[in-house]
């Protein structure tokens, strides 16, 4: 299959691993996302149907992957080929419900949002497709496990007044860790987790993150906060991964599993086996291709009146190019939620009016 892939290229993003998995499965992938220093691409204003029409070989599928760095090109609903999207951060913004209506088949990373997106899209071609690990990158390097606790994540989050930031500080004060504030390459992520006895995870909004799969794939015990979104279907809690309830429980369980090496390693081995058996990007893309190939319904935006299509695209545009950018700026300034609202609203209103 020839797949036209739209996302923002970045070597630690899910899109990067998805592209490699599709290629490993024998598919031809043409990148038509945003340009960057590593590869050519297209501006957000270029209609995607024109891009696809100009390709030397007609694709069999257009796949758009969130987050795409504010890349949501016009013309998706005019594409003469099946379209699909993989919405990852569904827990962070409801604009994705409007974006989903532009695609024939919709995949979301968090199970608890299935019903909401099925209602928004208006048909049942909306599927749960959890995140995963890339075993060529996220693997056990068989290095000495010199860190009690390992964590690789968003640097900006470490500076915010969040549960994740607070817990990272508590861990760093008590245990030997890697440098939480450093930016790591994909290969370095695998090495850090291979050097960690325990991989710490704290979700942003109750989501099952990439870190759960990456840490287990590298042979570490993953200790994550208690969340829904199908976590207990993906792993057997207590046998393949461990969960904590609060700060105190987190610290106590870290100390316990550091002191009980055989028990820790048994859970780590079981978690690793489960991930490699069921939770790689190869597994996810096999399911995605199967479901797309068996789909029969069309995206709502292919047939709705132009005015409705314009309103939906406008909502997506406002969030991608205005609201999300303003929220990011406010967060980077260290503002609390009330301060963010006061800072964002005047600027947003000015942009909408002008």
What are these regions (language model features)?
Residues 241-247, 257-261:
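Conserved acidic donor-binding segment of nucleotide-sugar-dependent glycosyltransferases
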Residues 77-85:
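Short beta-strand/loop segments at the ligand-binding rim of alpha/beta enzyme cores
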Residues 250:
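Catalytic phosphate/metal-binding cores of nucleic-acid and nucleotide-processing enzymes, i.e., regions
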Residues 210, 245, 279:
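Residue-level signal for the nucleotide or nucleotide-sugar donor/cofactor binding architecture
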Residues 190-191, 253, 257:
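Small beta-barrel nucleic-acid-binding modules, principally OB-folds
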Residues 1-51, 56-75, 88-237, 323, ...:
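Nucleotide-sugar donor-binding catalytic core of glycosyltransferases
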Residues 259-354:
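C-terminal amphipathic helix plus adjacent low-complexity
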